[in-house]
Swiss-Prot record:
Residues 6-236 form the ABC transporter domain. It is a peripheral membrane protein. It comes from Legionella pneumophila (strain Paris). Part of the ABC transporter complex PotABCD involved in spermidine/putrescine import. Responsible for energy coupling to the transport system. Its main location: membrane. It is found in: Cell inner membrane. Gene3D superfamilies: 2.40.50.100, P-loop containing nucleotide triphosphate hydrolases. The gene is potA. This is Spermidine/putrescine import ATP-binding protein PotA. ATP binds at residues 38-45. GO terms for molecular function: ABC-type polyamine transporter activity; ATP binding; ATP hydrolysis activity. Belongs to the ABC transporter superfamily. Spermidine/putrescine importer (TC 3.A.1.11.1) family. GO terms for cellular component: ATP-binding cassette (ABC) transporter complex.
Length: 364
C-alpha cells in the first residue's frame, strides 16, 4: 500500500472559543491534484495554513513524508504557497521575483539564471523576464507567483484561491494551464476554492468542506453524481430537490408520489416503505416536452415555462409545476432543432428516466 505524502490526523483548530476545524482527517497522495472546496468560512484556507506551517493546530497531527511537522516552521517544510494576492515584489522584475529564494540561499548566478528560465518557460513567461511585475496583467502576475513557488521544486504546492481575481475567460485558460503544469511537474497540488466548476474541471479528488468538517471526499464524478448528503448535492452544481415518501418497494425499485403522479425510482439505498427521502435530479437530466410531442404521459409531470434563459450552448428553463414548485431544466441548444423553440407560459410535460435521480436520507 502506497504511503500518502501528507496525512492529516484528527485536526482541530479554534481561535479562542470559535471552532474552525472539527476532527478533520485526510490523506493526500503523491502527484495528485486535490481541491479543498467549500463556502467562505468553512475552514479550507485554515487547513492550508496548517499544512504550510503558518498556523498551528489546536489538536491533532500533520505528517509530511511520514514525519510529524507540527513543530517545524514553514521554511523547514517542503511545501510552497501561492497566495490569493500573489505577494510579488512590485519593485523587482519578473526574473528577480522568481530568483528571490535562490538568492537568499546564495545560489550561484549561473544556476539562478538556468533555474529561473526553466521555471519561466514552464509558465510561458521567459520572454518577459526583464519586465517589471507592475507592468503585467493579472494572469501574468499569477504565473510569476507560480514560477516563484516551483523554483525549488517543492513536493507540495499549496494554492489559496489563486484564480478568484481573474476574469472568466482568463480563469478558464488558467485552469487548463495549472492542470497541465501539475502533470508536467508530477507535483502534488492542494488547491483551495469556493468555485465548483474549478474543482470539477481540475481535480483528481475533491474534499467538500462545510462548517469546519469534511462532508465528502471523492472524484469529481463521484461527488457530483453520488453526493453523500443534501449539502454536497446542493453545493456541487444545481439540483432540483423533491421530498418524497416510499409507498411501495418492488424488486430493485421504489414507488413514490410526486406532484400527484406515481413514479418509480431505483432503490439505491435499501430504503423501506414509509421512509422519507430527498429525491434529487440535476437540471441537465430533466427532459421537457411540448404538448404536441407527447402521446403517453405516464411518469411525466405537468408544468408551464415561467422563464427561458439562453446561454449560447444551452437553454435553461424554469418550469412551474402544478403545486407551484419551480424546477430547473437545462438542454443543449441546437438552432436547427424546432423542439427547443419554447415560449414563455407554454404548458409542457417534464420527466427524467429511472436511475437518473439521486436518493438521499431525509434530513428534515
Amino acid at each position: 500500500m502506497t504511503t500518502p505524502l501528507i496525512e492529516i490526523r484528527q485536526i482541530y483548530k479554534s481561535y479562542g472559543n470559535t471552532p474552525i476545524l472539527n476532527n478533520v482527517s485526510l490523506n493526500v497522495n503523491h502527484g495528485e491534484f486535490l481541491t479543498l472546496l467549500g463556502p467562505s468560512g468553512c475552514g479550507k484556507t485554515t487547513l492550508l495554513r496548517l499544512i504550510s506551517g503558518f498556523e498551528q493546530p489546536t489538536q491533532g497531527e500533520i505528517f509530511i513524508n511520514g514525519q510529524c511537522v507540527n513543530q517545524l516552521p514553514p521554511q523547514k517544510r517542503d511545501v510552497h504557497t501561492v497566495f490569493q494576492s500573489y505577494a510579488l515584489f512590485p519593485h523587482l522584475s519578473v526574473f528577480e521575483n522568481v530568483a528571490f529564494a535562490l538568492r537568499c540561499k546564495k545560489t550561484s548566478n549561473q544556476e539562478i539564471k538556468e533555474r529561473v528560465f526553466d521555471a519561466l518557460k514552464l509558465v510561458q513567461l521567459e520572454l518577459l523576464a526583464e519586465r517589471n511585475v507592475k507592468q503585467l496583467s493579472g494572469g501574468q502576475q499569477q504565473r510569476v507567483a507560480i514560477a516563484r513557488a516551483i523554483i525549488n521544486r517543492p513536493q507540495v504546492l499549496l494554492l489559496d484561491e489563486p484564480l478568484s481575481s481573474l476574469d472568466y475567460r482568463l480563469r478558464k485558460a488558467m485552469q487548463s494551464e495549472l492542470k497541465q503544469l501539475q502533470k508536467t511537474l508530477n507535483m502534488t497540488f492542494i488547491f483551495v476554492t469556493h468555485d465548483q466548476e474549478e474543482a470539477l474541471s481540475m481535480s483528481d479528488r475533491i474534499v467538500v468542506f462545510n462548517h469546519g468538517h469534511i462532508e465528502q471526499i471523492g472524484t469529481p464524478k463521484a461527488v457530483y453524481e453520488t453526493p453523500a448528503n443534501l449539502h454536497v448535492a446542493m453545493f456541487i452544481g444545481e439540483a432540483n430537490i423533491f421530498d418524497i415518501q416510499v409507498h411501495t418497494v418492488k424488486d430493485q425499485d421504489i414507488v413514490t408520489n410526486i406532484e400527484g403522479i406515481q413514479l418509480s425510482c431505483k432503490n439505491t439505498g435499501n430504503y423501506q416503505v414509509n421512509e422519507w427521502l430527498h429525491l434529487i435530479v440535476r437540471p441537465e437530466d430533466i427532459r421537457v416536452w411540448s404538448l404536441s410531442e407527447v402521446e403517453k404521459t405516464e411518469g411525466m409531470l405537468p408544468g408551464r415555462i415561467v422563464d427561458i434563459i439562453y446561454k449560447g450552448s444551452t437553454v435553461d428553463l424554469k418550469v412551474e409545476l402544478s403545486s407551484g414548485k419551480i424546477i430547473n431544466a437545462s438542454e443543449f441548444f441546437d438552432e436547427d432543432d424546432d423542439k427547443l423553440e419554447y415560449t414563455l407560459h407554454e404548458t409542457v410535460w417534464v420527466q427524467w428516466l429511472p436511475g437518473w435521480e439521486v436518493l438521499l436520507p431525509y434530513e428534515g
